[in-house]
């Protein structure tokens, strides 16, 4: 985007900020379910740096979301004021502090607008090329607010009976609901994926209570098909479908109408879950899981071919350093994340993204290497979840399928190191050593297959390791 004006921030901060907000929205009746892993926030105090040599005088106007100043060759200026720059070399340092959100800046025009040459640093730590998103190119925008788009929805059916009023929107949606009322006593509003769920007032997981006398109210966007209002109520209900501004590029049709309908339903379901990040589900959990996201990256290539939502998800999943545990607390989900960076480069060829995320890729890879046993196999600790699948597997000790995934993740990390101009030979060497040990520890000649683990002595065989061996 070079000199195209856009909002810029410390790389990964936009994603961490919106991940923080997203993971605090899972509501069940009158309480909230919190994510079961550490959730990180953006840095709130950031410096932005730019050195430029101008061949002619020009003006510099910096807008910011937050407090701070614009430093030009050591002299400080306020935000929003045009600063004259003479021809020659200038050192620009912009400081932005925002206690309640994402610190970011916007250069309105000229040679300093856009992303080219700008780096950022949270006062301490690594100075990196700035982060940005093609979604934020206008000065009036605030990257603290995600730019969803909205479409009005009408119920396909309204059913009134002695129990209340049921609004049916025909299919699952993710929408915000507005109510307007006059002289209305206290009101209950239930949301459900099925009619049964919506009508079950005492058990409905998504329920709102509207105080008596309320003239209008807006409920946060959530997943539902049905809205049920018990009892008699005189109100005007308005619904707006909330979605991410993604362009659908993939299309499918065939002579089999049912197959076409299945594809379109799958595409719509995926659209519902393509929000700030790829979600595992729009109602439960409404969280971002690395294993689910890994599958979403593949699907996205056939439906959107949009790198931005993939990169947002990867930044959000990775979090900040120092690492406290595996991503989503699951060992294999850390490995899928490492794989996803290399595969993303193979898809989109975005070298700048690989270089920007490299420090966090490196620290996650090192974190995994620190959690290996004497043979070099990756093992789960007491606080780790060794998942791989819900299937009944022998997970006592190093898991064969996980070692295969670990080897491929190390190879991917080594490849990404090369792309970032770094030395990844240690990762490649460890992967090679493990490859040579796999058959010795995990292959059962008598069974003609790979076993789950050697530690228990049970020599149990499931399909996972053997499928991974083929892949």
Model-derived segments and spans:
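Non-transmembrane amphipathic alpha-helical segments
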Residues: 407-410, 414
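Active-site acid/base region of carbohydrate-active enzymes
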Residues: 236-238, 245-265, 271, 278-295, ...
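A generic structural signal for solvent-exposed, polar alpha-helical segments
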Residues: 13-15, 49, 124, 138, ...
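Extracellular/oxidizing-compartment recognition motifs
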Residues: 1-276, 309-310, 352
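Conserved, well-structured interaction surfaces
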Residues: 323-326
């Amino acid at each position: 985007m070079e000199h195209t004006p856009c909002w810029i921030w410390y790389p990964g901060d936009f994603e961490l900020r919106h991940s923080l907000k997203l993971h605090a929205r899972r509501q069940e009746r009158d309480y909230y379910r919190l994510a079961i892993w550490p959730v990180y926030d953006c840095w709130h105090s950031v410096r932005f740096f730019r050195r430029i040599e101008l061949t002619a005088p020009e003006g510099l106007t910096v807008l910011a979301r937050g407090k701070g100043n614009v430093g030009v060759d050591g002299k400080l200026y306020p935000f929003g004021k045009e600063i004259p720059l003479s021809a020659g070399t200038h050192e620009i340092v912009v400081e932005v502090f925002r206690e309640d959100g994402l610190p970011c800046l916007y250069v309105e025009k000229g040679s300093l607008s856009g992303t080219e040459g700008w780096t950022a640093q949270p006062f301490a730590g690594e100075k990196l090329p700035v982060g940005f998103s093609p979604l934020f190119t206008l000065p009036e925008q605030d990257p603290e607010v995600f730019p969803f788009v909205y479409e009005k929805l009408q119920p396909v059916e309204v059913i009134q009976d002695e129990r209340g009023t049921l609004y049916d929107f025909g299919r699952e949606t993710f929408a915000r609901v507005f109510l307007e009322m006059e002289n209305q006593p206290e009101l209950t509003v239930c949301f459900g994926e099925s009619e049964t769920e919506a009508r079950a007032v005492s058990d409905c997981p998504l329920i709102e209570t509207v105080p008596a006398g309320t003239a209008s109210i807006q409920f946060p966007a959530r997943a539902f098909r049905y809205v049920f209002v018990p009892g008699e109520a005189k109100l005007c209900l308005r619904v707006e479908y909330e979605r991410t501004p993604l362009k659908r590029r993939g299309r499918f049709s065939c002579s089999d109408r049912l197959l076409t309908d299945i594809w379109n339903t799958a595409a719509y379901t995926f659209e519902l879950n393509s929000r700030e990040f790829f979600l595992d589900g729009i109602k439960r959990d409404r969280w971002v899981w690395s294993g689910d996201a890994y599958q979403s990256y593949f699907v996205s290539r056939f439906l959107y071919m949009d790198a931005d939502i993939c990169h947002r998800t990867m930044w959000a999943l990775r979090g900040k350093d120092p690492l406290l545990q595996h991503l989503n607390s699951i060992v294999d989900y850390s490995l899928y994340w490492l794989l996803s960076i290399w595969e993303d480069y193979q898809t989109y060829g975005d070298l700048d993204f690989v270089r920007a995320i490299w420090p966090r890729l490196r620290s996650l890879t090192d974190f995994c290497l620190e959690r290996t046993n004497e043979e070099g196999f990756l093992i789960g600790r007491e606080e780790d979840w060794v998942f791989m699948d819900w299937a009944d597997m022998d997970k006592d000790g190093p898991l064969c399928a996980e070692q295969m995934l670990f080897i491929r993740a190390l190879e991917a990390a080594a490849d990404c190191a090369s792309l970032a101009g770094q030395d990844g030979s240690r990762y490649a060497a460890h992967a090679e050593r493990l490859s040579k040990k796999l058959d010795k520890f995990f292959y059962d000649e008598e069974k003609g297959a790979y076993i789950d683990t050697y530690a228990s002595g049970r020599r149990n065989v499931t399909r996972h390791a053997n499928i991974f061996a083929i892949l």
